[in-house]
């Protein structure tokens, strides 16, 4: 048996402490290093930085459980990336529109930063958690060089009847 170097994209000096493969998507890897998080979509052939809002800090352990990625850090406590479903659906730089499969949702009556659609929305307060949105949140991928400037999403019931139409047109 022989060793294969799978550190392409992780800088020299970013000593890797932990590597975990996703429990559902083969070849989706997460690496915790001295200089933060990295992700590989191809079994470790190429790594990309994956910090999101996580400060650059040593990552000491990773655990994938209940569809979440839990990150243990050196001096910054634990971080949790909720719902790996979006990452599992990501397919790289696509040239066409793609609607990602939404997670199951519950209709409720509570306040959430995710309920607002305003140009002035600056995100949630750092000192507060965020309640889930009321209803379904749709995520989609739209290529930068798309010729279509308008999007229309039709939501249908189980019989194919349109129950709601959402458009990007003002």
Report each predicted region and the residues it spans.
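Solvent-exposed beta-strand/loop surfaces of large extracellular or lumenal domains
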Residues: 55-58, 161-170
